[in-house]
Amino acid sequence: MIFYDFEVFKEDWLAVFIDVTKKKEYVIINNPDELKALYEANSKDIWVGYNNRHYDQYIMKGILLGMNPKRINDWIIVEKKEGWQFSSAFNKVPMINYDVMPNPPVGLKTLEGFLGSNIKETDVDFRINRKLTKEEIEMTVFYCRHDVEETIKVFLEKIDEFNAMHGIIQAFPDIVNLSDIGDSEARITAKVLGCSRRSFEDEFDFYFLPCLQLKKYKYVQDWFEQKRQEALSMDLAHMDKYSKRTWYKEQGLETVVAGIPHSFGFGGVHGATATPIHKTGQLLHVDVNNYYPSMLIAWGLVTRAATNDNYPLVYNTRKAMKEKQIAAK
């Protein structure tokens, strides 16, 4: 497993690689041949980065293909386009990439701060219009190495996520393989379930589970039923996406639940106090293991896009892995 990070300037590029298996570091500066040798010696390894799914892998592939990394950099950073759109030739360079960046995205410096690490960034301006000096190269290498080391820390903090993905791959070797490790969990699960894109246009044909015990908050369910009837009368399901999106955003129920102001809508529920709450004594934060997946199986709510019944096996595989991880701690 190799952790890596690229830095790109107009006239220079560099990268730091840390092979945690061999316990070796590689610093490559403006040397495509050296990069090619490293890649070819480790082409079947897992390359781990922070945002490498959207950035670093395309810089690396571009250099290996003889492209200008600055052009790729500006395509992604300045023009805000997807790296894969730059060239179909990227497909000629197979890489097993695993991205540590969470979804929704959070900057590496933010997580470094949470970990109590130094979050100072390099003083070298990425917009420099000339060759870097020796001192600027050294400073950039220093901060690039720091980011790779921090990426390793973040990976270890989130290793359960990697193990879960790897566990699914091991459980379904005929459907997915190690090259899929870089996909999101949702995408890997979709492959395992054999999901295909389908259009139902019946999002308001929902029902309320009989297990609901809302008591004094029954009016929240009534509000959703009222909105359901309203949407059906408008035939909203068959309207264009813009009309749907506008209607969804306009719907909201503001109420107080357990003394906390809450906002209900079709995107979910959010609750928070206007000011922080300070309490002393015993505080319990209770979570239910696999609550949502368990509910899907219990009430037959697994996605209709699935073409097989692998979901319970995915569920049991992940549950068994979590139990092993907890026992090992």
Language-model segments: which ranges?
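Conserved "right-hand" nucleotidyltransferase catalytic core of DNA-directed polymerases
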Residues: 114-122, 128-299
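General alpha-helical segment detector with a strong preference for membrane-spanning helices
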Residues: 9, 55, 103, 151, ...
